[in-house]
Amino acid sequence: MAKSKDARVAVILECTSCIRNSVNKVLTGISRYITQKNRRNTPNRLELRKFCPYCYKHMIHGEIKK
């Protein structure tokens, strides 16, 4: 029998710096990325270092609830 495919889910990553420092910016907005994670291997929240076009640098993007 084949294994079920519900271990891999789509998650949304959001810039943690844009949420905290939304004041005094040239561009206003929040950077978001869509990726996948395996729930069996990473049961806790995912955090990746990605480029934020609003902060103009690489920042930590954390998983948010849908």
UniProtKB/Swiss-Prot annotation:
Keywords: Plastid, Ribonucleoprotein, Ribosomal protein
GO molecular function: structural constituent of ribosome
Top-rank lineage group of the source organism: Eukaryota
Any one of the GO CC terms: ribosome
Presence of the UniProt keyword Ribosomal protein in the record: yes
InterPro entries with a match to the protein in the record: Ribosomal_bL33 (IPR001705), Ribosomal_bL33_CS (IPR018264), Ribosomal_bL33_sf (IPR038584), Ribosomal_zn-bd (IPR011332)
Gene Ontology biological process terms in this record: translation
Main location: plastid
Compartmental location: Plastid
Pfam families linked: Ribosomal_L33 (PF00471)
Stated family: Belongs to the bacterial ribosomal protein bL33 family.
Name of the featured protein: Large ribosomal subunit protein bL33c
Organism in which the protein naturally occurs: Epifagus virginiana (Beechdrops)
Gene behind the chain: rpl33
